[in-house]
Each structure stands twice: as C-alpha cells, then as structure tokens.
C-alpha cells in the first residue's frame, strides 16, 4: 500500500491574503482568469474563501482582469 505525500500549502504563514497582493492572487487563477478550485490549490476552506474574496475585490478595483482578452 502506497501513500501519497501531502503537498504543502502554497500560502506561507507570513503571506497576507489581501486584494493588494496581486502576485499571490495570480497563483490562484487560470490563464483565462477563472478562480482555481480548492482541491487544485491544496488550501484549506478558510483560505479558499479569503482568496476568492480578495480576487473578487481586486477584480472590482481593476487590479485583476475579469477575463483574459488575449485569446
């Protein structure tokens, strides 16, 4: 029986989940601009909610695009 090794969270304890932290938020969206699901991100439900809120807030303030127009 083989066990898969648990991946570490991409969010470090020192990272702040904030709408102004575009480098961190861009790790959790696809090239098309969609928010990646929690199972792909390998983060907790609480972190996923905070990431989703921050991405939506950054989109509203035009820090992140709603869609990628380069298709």
From Swiss-Prot:
The protein's predominant localisation is: plastid
Q: Which GO terms describe its biological process?
A: translation
This entry carries the following GO cellular component terms, namely: chloroplast; mitochondrial small ribosomal subunit
Protein location? Plastid, Chloroplast
What are the protein's UniProt keywords? Chloroplast, Plastid, Ribonucleoprotein, Ribosomal protein, RNA-binding, rRNA-binding
**What terms describe the molecular function in GO for this protein?**
small ribosomal subunit rRNA binding; structural constituent of ribosome
Tell whether Chloroplast is among the UniProt keywords. yes
What the record says about family reads: Belongs to the bacterial ribosomal protein bS18 family.
Q: How does it assemble?
A: Part of the 30S ribosomal subunit.
Recorded hits in NCBIfam families, A to Z, give:
S18
Protein name (record)? Small ribosomal subunit protein bS18c
Q: Which organism is it from?
A: Mesostigma viride
């Amino acid at each position: 029986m083989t066990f898969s090794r648990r991946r570490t969270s991409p969010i470090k304890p020192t990272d702040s989940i904030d709408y102004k932290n575009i480098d961190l938020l861009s790790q959790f969206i696809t090239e098309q601009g969609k928010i990646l699901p929690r199972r792909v991100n390998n983060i907790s439900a609480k972190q996923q909610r905070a990431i989703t809120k921050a991405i939506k807030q950054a989109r509203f303030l035009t820090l992140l695009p709603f869609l990628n127009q380069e298709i």
